[in-house]
A protein has these predicted regions:
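Active-site-adjacent substrate-binding region
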Residues: 49, 58-162
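Acidic/histidine-rich catalytic neighborhood of metal-dependent amide-processing enzymes
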Residues: 1-75
Length: 162
């Protein structure tokens, strides 16, 4: 992106305090994204869409289509998954329904109204990876090929936007 600018602006936001509380208690969960949605870095900030990268580098990762993403940002979700399939990553970005996870993208959708999808290693049949929220959630469980695939999908998607 620094070498060849895409046709669209790209903002990167890093959220904190996602897992601080419980997802069924909005006053203790995803505090960083909730704060940002109510206090954006630029007054009256708006974006065409958002993509939340959530646990996108694990070995054996599979990304199903999150229900919250489908509800609020279905067009973006389908376009990203089609891009992945066209690049040969259909076994990674699986065309199946995932869970309806309350996560940072939920608050970006609900509170600031920016259509946002969640690319997350979660499927209905397997749930979260076995290393999720354990002391084994460490760098040796990261797969550089999975990270490369996700990066290739996003770069291709972004550079093909008009």
């Amino acid at each position: 992106i620094a070498v060849q600018k895409p046709n669209v602006a790209v903002d990167i936001i890093l959220f904190d305090s996602e897992d601080y509380g419980h997802s069924d208690h909005h006053n203790s969960y995803c505090l960083g994204s909730q704060y940002w949605a109510l206090n954006p870095h630029v007054p009256r900030y708006n974006a065409r869409f958002g993509i939340l990268l959530d646990m996108v580098g694990g070995k054996g990762a599979r990304f199903a289509k999150d229900l919250i993403s489908s509800f609020y940002a279905g067009e973006v979700l389908d376009s990203v998954w089609k891009t992945a399939a066209s690049l040969g990553y259909g076994s990674l970005f699986v065309n199946e329904e995932g869970g309806g996870l309350i996560d940072d993208h939920y608050y970006v959708n609900k509170m600031i109204g920016i259509p946002c999808i969640d690319i997350i290693d979660y499927t209905n049949d397997e749930g979260f990876p076995s290393t999720w929220h354990t002391v084994n959630d460490t760098m040796e469980n990261i797969d550089k090929e999975v990270l490369k695939a996700v990066g290739n999908v996003l770069i291709t998607y972004i550079y093909n936007l008009k």
